[in-house]
């Protein structure tokens, strides 16, 4: 794509170019370290850095143009410069244009919410595949082409930057995908990482307090997540979430779901939690049928209803949904059972890292635990929502018999400060059934070693993440492998 064509795609005035400067643009990035020959470099003014400071570095790496919101007084660009109203929006729009708008060639389902979006994304992908649609997936765990092989992005985020999103969607199309499911975080929606994606279906799970360090207020957090519903042609809405009332009627079409409310379009009846998983009756526009889902946790009924509603909108039948649920094997790091021997406690790895999700996880495991319930839990450092640290300590000590408080990506926040806050949440309620062990590996060892057969140990917060971030280092991490190593020593 020529630079003049890119300007036209962004609805910008034609740049002053000649045959030499109207060069071919082959990619776009906002990171000068990622520039390849032929790239357009988007200079974004952020809280800490101004991308315009890296224009010469981008030029040296082979960039052919710069896009930005305007040069400062006295500043010049070493490359042709396109002035845009919003640099992040331009990054996304340019990425979509250069990739040929791949989402227009796919049926795209977006899933957002504080909790439940990863399980719902994986389940929706599985249901669509069970219905015969070659389906890709882009989620916090990684991304999949229709071949089912899980690939990972080399970063610690839920949704990659806009160029990676568009390139991945193009890769899916090239691999024969007919549909894809994309997990959309509030950061991705706020920072325009998923701008330029053509959404067929938006799935809303629920909203609770998280990432307020970034969004400032819960209302702002909601407003960013709401963007997905505003941009979709069809919405799948959870009527058990109070925020849903503000989402009704926004999308051209919608349906509702609930594990509790019998007035929802998609609803569950006669829910049973068995050793083999969940059994319930589905009442829906697709018909009424008996469902079996081999997953732990009553809350997964709502995730299943959301996935079924989305898949049905894209053509899945009741029989296909029923078969798809029965064959679903869950998500790595989401209520994942770590294999152990007959004399070992049951060890579960789960991503639960907010007070509501931790409460759900512990409540679920309590119902099927004959002995004591243990939890290993930390809270993220940096500026990331310090307000949930004390509530996490309160929930952990209220619902578990033994709580081990530890690290979880403390970054540049002193670990002891985080532990003190979590301990405060427990002590203010008069509880002392906890111990603080700063090193997460040692915390896991302590819990798994001290737990007895019949006990359950929940390793909460990390799930499938493959790094552990500390102030001065980032360690490779595998929570399941850590648990297996301790179980093997018993």
Swiss-Prot record:
Example GO BP: regulation of cell shape
Pathway where it operates: Cell wall biogenesis; peptidoglycan biosynthesis
The entry's keywords: ATP-binding, Cell cycle, Cell division, Cell shape, Cell wall biogenesis/degradation, Cytoplasm, Ligase, Nucleotide-binding, Peptidoglycan synthesis
Residues making up the signal peptide according to the UniProt record: none
Subcellular location, record wording: Cytoplasm
Pfam family, one: Mur_ligase
GO terms under cellular component: cytoplasm
Family: Belongs to the MurCDEF family. MurE subfamily.
UniProt protein name: UDP-N-acetylmuramyl-tripeptide synthetase
């Amino acid at each position: 794509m020529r630079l003049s064509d890119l300007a036209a795609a962004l609805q910008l005035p034609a740049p002053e170019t000649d045959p030499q400067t109207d060069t071919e643009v082959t990619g776009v990035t906002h990171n000068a370290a990622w520039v390849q020959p032929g790239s357009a470099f988007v200079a974004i003014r952020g809280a800490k850095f101004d991308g315009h400071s890296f224009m010469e570095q981008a030029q040296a790496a082979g960039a052919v143009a710069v896009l930005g919101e305007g040069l400062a007084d006295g500043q010049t660009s070493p490359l042709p410069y396109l002035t845009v109203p919003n640099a992040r929006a331009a990054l996304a729009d340019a990425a979509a244009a250069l990739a040929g708008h791949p989402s227009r060639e796919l049926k795209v389902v977006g899933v957002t919410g504080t909790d439940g979006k990863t399980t719902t994304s994986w389940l929706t992908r599985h249901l669509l595949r069970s219905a015969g649609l070659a389906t890709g997936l882009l989620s916090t765990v990684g991304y999949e082409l229709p071949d089912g092989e899980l690939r990972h992005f080399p970063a610690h985020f839920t949704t990659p930057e806009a160029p990676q999103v568009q390139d991945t969607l193009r890769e899916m199309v090239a691999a024969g995908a007919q549909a894809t499911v994309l997990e959309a975080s509030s950061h991705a929606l706020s920072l325009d990482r998923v701008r330029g994606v053509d959404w067929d279906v938006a799935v809303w799970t629920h909203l609770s307090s998280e990432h307020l360090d970034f969004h400032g207020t819960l209302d702002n957090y909601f407003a960013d997540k709401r963007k997905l519903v505003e941009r979709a042609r069809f919405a799948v809405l959870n009527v058990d979430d109070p925020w849903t009332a503000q989402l009704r009627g926004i999308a051209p079409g919608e349906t509702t779901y609930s594990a509790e409310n019998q007035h929802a379009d998609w609803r569950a009846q006669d829910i049973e939690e068995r050793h083999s998983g969940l059994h319930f009756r589905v009442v829906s526009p697709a018909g009424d049928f008996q469902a079996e889902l081999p997953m732990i946790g009553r809350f997964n009924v709502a995730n299943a209803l959301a996935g079924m509603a989305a898949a049905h909108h894209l053509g899945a039948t009741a029989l296909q949904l029923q078969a798809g649920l029965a064959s679903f094997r869950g998500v790595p790091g989401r209520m994942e059972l770590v294999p152990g021997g007959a004399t070992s406690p049951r060890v579960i790895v789960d991503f639960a890292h907010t007070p509501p999700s931790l409460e759900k996880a512990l409540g679920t495991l309590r119902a099927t635990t004959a002995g004591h319930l243990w939890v290993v839990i930390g809270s993220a450092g940096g500026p990331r929502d310090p307000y949930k640290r004390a509530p996490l300590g309160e929930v952990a000590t209220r619902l578990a018999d033994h709580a081990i408080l530890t690290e979880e990506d403390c970054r540049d926040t002193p670990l002891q400060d985080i532990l003190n806050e979590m301990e405060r949440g427990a002590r203010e309620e008069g509880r002392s059934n906890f111990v603080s062990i700063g090193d997460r590996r040692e915390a896991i060892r302590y819990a798994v070693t001290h737990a007895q057969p019949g006990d359950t140990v929940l390793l909460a917060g990390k799930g499938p993440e493959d790094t552990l971030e500390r102030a001065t280092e980032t360690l490779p991490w595998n929570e399941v492998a850590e648990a297996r190593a301790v179980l093997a020593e018993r």
